[in-house]
Every structure is written in C-alpha cells, then in structure tokens.
Amino acid sequence: MKLISICALATLLLTTTVGLAQSRKDQKIMQDAQKAKTTLLETSPGLERFFEDSAGYVIFPNVGKGGFIIGGASGNGVVYEDGEPVGMADLKKLNIGLQAGGQAIIEVIFFETDVDLKRFKTEKFQFAAETSAVALKSGIAFNAKYKDGVAVFALPKAGLMADASVGGQKFSYKAF
C-alpha cells in the first residue's frame, strides 16, 4: 500500500512539473506574441484593419526557417478570437528545392470569417503548395487581401533566406 502511495505521489509531482513547464512556455510565447503584434503594427500600420476586422488570427512570434536544398520551418504561436487568446498553435514545414540560408520571422495569419477560423481550429490545417506570405515592408499591408479566407504576413527578424513561401506549412491547435 505504501508503494502505491509513493507511486501516486511521484506521478502527481511529475504531472504538475510538466504542466508548470508547459504553462511557463505558453506564457513566454504569449508575451512574445504581444511584442510581435506591436512590432507588426509599428512596421506596417495597415495591418490594424486586419487585427480589428478579422474573425481571428494566429501570431507566430518566432518562426525559424532554414535549409540547403532540404529545408524546414517551425514555430509556436497564439490563436486569438475576437482579440482574445483562445489557444496555442504550432507550425511545421518541410520542403525540398532551391534554397539556402536561415531566417527568423514573425508570421501572422488572419482568418476572414468564423468558418475560416473554425477550420483552422478543428482540422489539421495546411496551406496549398503555391501559397506565399506578404513580406511586410512599410505600407504594403494597405493593399493586401484575403485569399481563400486567409491573409498571411511575414516580417523578417534576422537572417537571410531566398524563400517567402508558406505553402506546405502544417498546423496544429490546442485550446486553453
């Protein structure tokens, strides 16, 4: 009986520790997402209308991309609905082709309607191979439009890479 109690206590402590570690990681990502939103709006004030009018959006504050012939990207982000955080998302991409370098970017995906946001949250959402992000420069977001219910923007943070595609990115979503 004593062994069972010790095992139960050990399991509880391990579960609590893992939960706290994940919670801290999520909190850090949420803080980074808020900073990323500020940076995006400072860089391209035209995004304000997307933040205000979209059904929801996901901000990936630190997407790492890299490759030489074979490349990949990954990042964690926060999903917002009506401006409020509702969950966490992660992004993965693997591709083969002419590419070289490495880059860190901020990526934001806006969902035009509730149906588009729900599709992201309930399916294993991914972009078609030809989809690309609008690389943000001052003023460019004013002319951007939704395509198939989404609008994607990327802001380079560091590094250099000759690839602006987001096609083939796969996402997963976990509600709070």
Regions found by a protein language model. Give the residues of each.
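Bacterial N-terminal signal peptides
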Residues: 7-16
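Small-residue-enriched, tightly packed secondary-structure blocks
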Residues: 22-176
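Sec/Tat signal peptide C-region and signal peptidase I cleavage site
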Residues: 17-21
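Bacterial N-terminal signal peptides that target proteins for export
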Residues: 1-7
